[in-house]
């Protein structure tokens, strides 16, 4: 028997051990657990604001921690910081590369970041002495496009890339502190845990991974999707994650039980998911789809309880405010809408 065959058998045995361990953790099912829960009822939300100003597809958005400002990135080569109360543009930042795929707001409100097919993460200071917004750093070491970025604080940012890696950067020095290797397909999205100690990534290898920021190691891997994972987010308490995929489903994975709890899908939905976000309580899951809609799911019962339909093209990004009072959707129709 060849060495390869031996290793293959060993791998299969290990897989079986993992499956058994997961079964032992599954002392109940989510459906059993929530059978006594009140039904959410129909969730109806209205468009409260429409943010007009981009001249092309919007690819990404991210709320500031004040639940008032948000940043959006568009194919028109602009990064716009909006005041969602008044719909005024606080900053319109022309980008060096218009092929932007992601943007992020720093928790402090001092910086925004973006990146895309230029393989770089550009950091912009919003609080410069001169009052104008300027590039404070360009972080380049990825060998593929930048798919997502999220600040940990004003000096640390995590990025995911088409080169299959994620990276933690020291913004001051412009250097990568840690490279997170393990995915076997383009890394499409990432999300940081509520305590900023962990982050999760979703990739075109159809897996999601949980990483330890300080140790630089992969703690857990979650499989089950049948196609690329485009979007990922943490449950508000940080103990579960949700993924959205081109296989037309979202899935909920529990970190402690190390397995999938439920999937959110419907026979009538046949298109991919671009973006996912939970309500503040975690009871509602918002998911943006290629069919121009945003579906609202009861995360516990797995039923669709509402739909946000106001866009004339793909919903490319969405986000819930830190105070839980509003959800914003961004679309290829060039508009952002704020709902509640």
Curated annotation (Swiss-Prot):
Compartments (UniProt record): Cytoplasm, Perinuclear region
Residue ranges crossing the lipid bilayer per the database entry: none
Xref: InterPro entries: G-protein_beta_WD-40_rep (IPR020472), Gprotein_B (IPR001632), Guanine_nucleotide-bd_bsu (IPR016346), WD40/YVTN_repeat-like_dom_sf (IPR015943), WD40_repeat_CS (IPR019775), WD40_repeat_dom_sf (IPR036322), WD40_rpt (IPR001680)
Domain of life: Eukaryota
Signal peptide: none
Stored Pfam families: WD40_Gbeta (PF25391)
Major location (coarse): cytoplasm
Keywords annotated in UniProt: Cytoplasm, Repeat, Transducer, WD repeat
WD repeats by residue range: 53-83, 95-125, 141-170, 182-212, 224-254, 268-298, 310-340
An annotated GO BP: G protein-coupled receptor signaling pathway
SUPFAM superfamilies hit by this protein: WD40 repeat-like (SSF50978)
GO cellular component assignments: cytoplasm; heterotrimeric G-protein complex; perinuclear region of cytoplasm
GO molecular function: signaling receptor complex adaptor activity
Protein family per UniProt: Belongs to the WD repeat G protein beta family.
Function per UniProt: Guanine nucleotide-binding proteins (G proteins) are involved as a modulator or transducer in various transmembrane signaling systems. The beta and gamma chains are required for the GTPase activity, for replacement of GDP by GTP, and for G protein-effector interaction.
Quaternary data: G proteins are composed of 3 units, alpha, beta and gamma. Interacts with RASD2.
Name this polypeptide is given: Guanine nucleotide-binding protein G(I)/G(S)/G(T) subunit beta-3
Gene transcribed to yield this protein: GNB3
């Amino acid at each position: 028997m060849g060495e390869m065959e031996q290793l293959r058998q060993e791998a299969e045995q290990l897989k079986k051990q993992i499956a058994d361990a997961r079964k032992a953790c599954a002392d109940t099912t989510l459906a059993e657990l929530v059978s006594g829960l009140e039904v959410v009822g129909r969730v109806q939300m209205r468009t409260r604001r429409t943010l007009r100003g981009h001249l092309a597809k919007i690819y990404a958005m991210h709320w500031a921690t004040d639940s008032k400002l948000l940043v959006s990135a568009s194919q028109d080569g602009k990064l716009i910081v909006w005041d969602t109360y008044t719909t005024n543009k606080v900053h319109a930042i022309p980008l060096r590369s218009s092929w932007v795929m992601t943007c992020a707001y720093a928790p402090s409100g001092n910086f925004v970041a973006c990146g895309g097919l230029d393989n770089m993460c550009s950091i912009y200071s919003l609080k410069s002495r001169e009052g104008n917004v300027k590039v404070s750093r360009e972080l380049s070491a990825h060998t593929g496009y930048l798919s997502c970025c999220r600040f940990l604080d004003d000096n640390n940012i995590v990025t995911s890339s088409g080169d299959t890696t994620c990276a933690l950067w020291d913004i001051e020095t412009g250097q990568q502190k840690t490279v997170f290797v393990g995915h076997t397909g383009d890394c499409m999205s990432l999300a940081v845990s509520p305590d900023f100690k962990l982050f999760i990534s979703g990739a075109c290898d159809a897996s999601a991974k949980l990483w330890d920021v300080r140790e630089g190691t992969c703690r857990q891997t979650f499989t089950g999707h049948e196609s690329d994972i485009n979007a990922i987010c943490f449950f508000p308490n940080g103990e579960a994650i949700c993924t959205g995929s081109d296989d037309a489903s979202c899935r909920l994975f529990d970190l402690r039980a190390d397995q999938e709890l439920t999937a959110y899908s419907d026979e009538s939905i046949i298109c991919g998911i671009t973006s996912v976000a939970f309500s503040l309580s975690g009871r509602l899951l918002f998911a943006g789809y290629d069919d121009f809609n945003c579906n609202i799911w009861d995360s516990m019962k797995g039923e669709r309880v509402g739909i946000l339909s106001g866009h004339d093209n793909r919903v490319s990004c969405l986000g819930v405010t830190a105070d839980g009072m509003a959800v914003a959707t961004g679309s290829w129709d060039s508009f952002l809408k704020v709902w509640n």
